[in-house]
Curated annotation (Swiss-Prot):
Known role: Catalyzes the addition and repair of the essential 3'-terminal CCA sequence in tRNAs without using a nucleic acid template. Adds these three nucleotides in the order of C, C, and A to the tRNA nucleotide-73, using CTP and ATP as substrates and producing inorganic pyrophosphate. tRNA 3'-terminal CCA addition is required both for tRNA processing and repair. Also involved in tRNA surveillance by mediating tandem CCA addition to generate a CCACCA at the 3' terminus of unstable tRNAs. While stable tRNAs receive only 3'-terminal CCA, unstable tRNAs are marked with CCACCA and rapidly degraded.
Name the record gives this protein: Multifunctional CCA protein
Binding-site residues, CTP: G8, R11, R91, R137, R140
Written domain comment of the UniProt record: Comprises two domains: an N-terminal domain containing the nucleotidyltransferase activity and a C-terminal HD domain associated with both phosphodiesterase and phosphatase activities.
Requisite cofactors: Mg(2+); Ni(2+)
CDD domains: HDc, NT_ClassII-CCAase
Organism: Vibrio vulnificus (strain YJ016)
BP term (GO), one: tRNA 3'-terminal CCA addition
Binding-site positions, Mg(2+): D21, D23
E.C. code: 2.7.7.72, 3.1.3.-, 3.1.4.-
UniProt keyword list: ATP-binding, Hydrolase, Magnesium, Metal-binding, Multifunctional enzyme, Nickel, Nucleotide-binding, Nucleotidyltransferase, RNA repair, RNA-binding, Transferase, tRNA processing
Family membership noted in the UniProt record: Belongs to the tRNA nucleotidyltransferase/poly(A) polymerase family. Bacterial CCA-adding enzyme type 1 subfamily.
Subunit structure of this chain's protein: Monomer. Can also form homodimers and oligomers.
Domain HD, residue spans: 228-329
């Protein structure tokens, strides 16, 4: 029985970046031997076992054969005769097909170390096209490794385009699409996930609402980049710099979906996009099974970002009305998340990345002033029933007015 560390752990170790998960492959063993050694079986479709102490995953070496459509259409073959090279051959990218033994000796039959050095994401074999999920995985690796200068090999991009052309992406479940998208939101460069999917044609299939933004013009006065799709990539990049929250990053990526359905006769203006975008966000989130926490913030940002950009013009009563609608009295962190998205939107414009965003400070000032009006003081002054809320509202507006006058 031979045990090797494989996949992302070896890749990240060689790149000098933190290793979080360790996966192992076992060559020359049977399931019975693993059970006798105290390992617990967890694999449903193929033999994967948990180590009795570390609880890390150990998989028996296996080969795969395409038997049907989609990423589930595979038959696994495992036996003590399957070699390490055969197991590594079924993997997606050369940089993920390097193994390391207990002595630290590397086994790299497919040139993964050279591709690590050259910063290339390259498929291991032509069997790459058999699994449509790999299109999304490569896009995610491009996002994860973008700061190190990685790019997708031209021949791998061609295979990704052929997978898209085959129609196999439609076999991906909503859960798998969201799983990869969500993981990409936690990478250093989430915009690369969208950019690579766009390049191979997959964005139009899995996230058509975002793909529809490319080629849609905006007023050059406010958007030097003009193209709404390019703006979306820039906003995604800025959101990742401003916040590590996947929820904030998601909301920033989808806040302008409404611009994708503006009639061309109205271009480059998008007067109704804050309203039309709401339906598209709901539709996207339902189809891809996006968690409610992500959907809710995205809807708020979509509806309010234009108002917040105009903070200098907003009347105190309008500000309080917005605070009420967002329910920031009970959820203070929500306002901060929305302002981060708006700041990313403001900075996500060609050549304007470093422009200040005083609107956030003004909204926060107004919020703190309104928050200082406590309901207890209203009750102590003799107000009862519905009059309590009305008076608190009136005092909040006055407090905001005074705070902004003194600013």
């Amino acid at each position: 029985m031979e045990v090797y560390l494989v996949g992302g752990a070896v890749r990240d170790k060689l790149l000098g970046i933190p290793v979080y998960d360790q996966d192992w492959v076992v060559v020359g063993a049977t399931a019975e031997q693993m059970l006798n050694a105290g390992y617990s079986p967890v694999g449903k479709d193929f033999p994967v076992f948990l180590h009795p102490k570390t609880k890390q995953e150990y998989a028996l070496a296996r080969t795969e054969r395409k038997t049907g459509q989609g990423y589930k259409g595979f038959e696994c073959f495992f036996s003590p005769d399957v070699t390490l090279e055969e197991d590594l051959l079924r993997r997606d990218l050369t940089i993920n097909a390097i193994a390391m033994d207990s002595q630290g000796v590397l086994y790299d039959p497919y040139g993964g170390q050279q591709d690590l050095q050259d910063r290339i994401l390259r498929h291991v074999s032509e069997a790459f096209v058999e699994d449509p999920l790999r299109v999304l995985r490569v896009a995610r690796f491009a996002a994860k490794l973008a700061p190190l200068g990685f790019r997708v090999a031209d021949e791998t991009m061609q295979l990704m385009q052929s997978i898209v052309a085959s129609g196999e992406l439609s076999a991906l479940t909503a859960e798998r699409v969201w799983q990869e998208w969500h993981k990409s939101l936690l990478t250093p460069a989430p915009q690369q996930f969208l950019a690579v999917l766009r390049q191979c044609g997959a964005l139009a299939v899995v996230l058509p609402e975002i793909d529809a933004l490319f080629g849609v013009p905006q007023p050059e006065k406010w958007h030097p980049e003009i193209d709404t799709g390019i703006h979306t990539l820039l906003v995604a990049e800025q959101a990742a710099k401003l916040s590590s929250s996947a929820v904030v990053r998601f909301a920033a990526q989808v806040h302008d979906l409404g611009k994708g359905v503006t009639p061309p006769s109205e271009w480059p203006s998008h007067k109704m996009h804050c309203h039309t975008g709401l339906k598209l966000i709901k539709q996207l989130c339902e189809r891809v099974r996006v968690p409610n926490e992500f959907r809710d913030l995205a809807l708020m940002v979509c509806e309010q970002h234009s108002n917040i950009h105009r903070a200098a013009e907003l009347k105190p009563q309008t500000m309080v009305k917005i605070f009420n609608k967002l329910d920031v009295w009970r959820k203070a962190e929500r306002l901060n998340d929305i302002l981060l998205c708006c700041q990313a939107d403001h900075a996500g414009r060609q050549g304007l990345q470093d422009h200040p965003y005083p609107q956030a400070e003004r909204i926060q000032l107004a919020y703190q002033a309104a928050l200082s009006v406590e309901v207890q003081s209203v009750i102590q002054d003799g107000f009862k029933g519905p009059a309590i809320r009305d008076e608190q509202e009136r005092r909040r507006i006055e407090a905001v007015k005074a705070a902004l006058l003194n600013a």
